[in-house]
Design a protein with these regions (language model features):
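Hydrophobic alpha-helical transmembrane segments
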Residues: 1-9, 88-95, 155-172
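Long, hydrophobic alpha-helical segments
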Residues: 1-23, 119
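Hydrophobic/aromatic residues in alpha-helical transmembrane segments
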Residues: 10-17, 65, 99-100, 146, ...
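Residue-level signal for transmembrane alpha-helical positions in Major Facilitator Superfamily
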Residues: 13, 61, 96, 173-174
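Terminal transmembrane helical anchor/hairpin motif
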Residues: 114-199
Length: 206
């Protein structure tokens, strides 16, 4: 039940994270929203809180429909709270990649590019962790893979809160960097950005 859930819901988290601000910017709405009597920080925090709320509701629905309901129909040894533990780990995992997608959306020229890169890293993390379990040479690389620290059904017996805190901390760093970047970047009127750099013009010789 939990093996592919980080990938399936993770794709949604990446798409949502990359589009929290970049989507409205490319559609020409963000400059109109920013013109309202609300600070950039307030807009940013509101979008992030909405994203986290949506993710929490999705995971609660998956917990209730996927585990709680079947547990009431069949004899399942775990309690409802124990069945909720893997979703706490999954929330931290999704927060990390959602924050990464948000940061990339503030750096890269387009939301599509940000979502593609974050999604690629998500899938790469899955394969690196899997290979690290069977290929000895990949074990070191797997230590740097976020998927390694996702706790699936084993978390019902006990959750490693250090791993959860680590995923949340890395995700928080990504979100803070995205906030810092959003405060200092120019908002495009519409369309995708580019890679062009503004160079200082050489002053004519006297």
């Amino acid at each position: 039940y939990f093996s592919l859930m980080p990938i399936i819901i993770g794709i949604f988290a990446v798409l949502a994270g990359s589009g929290l601000l970049a989507s409205d910017e490319e559609n020409g709405r963000l400059d109109l929203i920013a013109a309202q009597p609300i600070s950039r920080s307030g807009l940013f925090v509101g979008r992030v809180l909405a994203f986290l709320t949506a993710m929490a509701l999705i995971l609660l629905a998956a917990w209730f429909l996927g585990l709680v309901v079947p547990a009431t129909l069949f004899d399942f040894p775990a309690t409802w709270l124990e069945m909720l533990r893997p979703f706490a780990s999954l929330f931290a995992f999704l927060f990390l990649f959602g924050g990464l997608a948000l940061l990339l959306g503030m750096i890269l020229p387009s939301r599509r590019m940000a979502a593609s890169l974050a999604g690629g890293l998500l899938i790469l993390s899955y394969f690196v962790t899997g290979l690290g379990e069977i290929v000895e040479d990949m074990a070191v690389a797997a230590d740097f893979s976020p998927y390694t620290y996702f706790q699936s059904g084993d978390a019902m017996a006990g959750l490693n809160w250090t791993w959860v805190a680590g995923l949340l901390a890395v995700g928080a760093v990504f979100v803070l960097l995205a906030w810092w970047r959003f405060l200092r970047r120019d908002i495009r009127v519409a369309g995708e950005g580019g890679w062009s750099l503004r160079l200082r013009r050489r002053q004519p010789a006297a």
